[in-house]
Design a protein with these regions (language model features):
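N-terminal, Lys/Arg- and Ser/Thr-rich interaction peptides
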Residues: 1-23
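Alpha-helix initiation and N-capping motif
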Residues: 10, 64, 154-157
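Short, low-complexity, charged/polar segments at coil/turn and helix-coil boundaries
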Residues: 19-131
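Protruding loop/beta-arch "assembly-hinge" segments enriched in small, turn-prone residues
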Residues: 136-167
């Protein structure tokens, strides 16, 4: 048995499917932006508001503010940045405004986005060249707290998506 669709019905069905797909993609983008924002807030709070660093790490001092100002995120889709945190510059203990760090953080996030040519990529960065040195050699929490939070939230997001697609 076959059913003949009325004229224009196929196009209408295709349009509805496309709308649903767009809505799904927008929900993913919104959630990834929320996760990125929370991760950056956690990473910056560890230093600027005397938050608790990740287990096994210590907080670092904000001397020039360039390191904390370089912390932010970019959300990329198919290698192109579709949204980015503000990389807000904060003032250091020495009065330095942290604008250099803000600029370097943005540039580094954009550079890393190009390395992810397919799908979505949530990129959490500390853009100053000495960030890994401070974190790894001096055991200071630069991005660890933010990264751990992002990983946990992403796992939860994946679990929800998996459950929704099973239904």
């Amino acid at each position: 048995m076959s059913v003949k669709l009325p004229q224009g019905a196929e196009q209408a069905i295709d349009e509805e499917i496309a709308k649903g797909f767009e809505g799904f993609n927008q929900a993913i983008v919104d959630e990834l932006n929320r996760i990125g924002t929370e991760a950056v807030t956690r990473a910056r709070r560890t230093v600027t508001e005397h938050g608790i660093p990740a287990a096994g790490y210590e907080a670092y001092k904000v001397r020039t503010a360039n390191l904390v100002s370089s912390i932010g995120f970019a959300l990329a889709c198919n290698g192109k940045v579709i949204s980015m945190s503000g990389f807000e510059a904060v003032q250091g203990e020495d009065g330095t405004p942290g604008t250099e760090g803000s600029e370097k953080g943005k540039a580094y996030a954009k550079q890393l986005a190009m390395q992810h040519p397919q799908g979505y990529a949530l990129i959490l960065v500390a853009g100053m060249h000495y960030a890994s040195y401070v974190q790894e050699l001096h055991n200071r929490d630069v991005l660890v707290s933010g990264q751990l939070l992002a990983e946990s939230l992403l796992r939860n997001m994946q679990r929800i998506i998996d459950e929704e697609t099973k239904q």
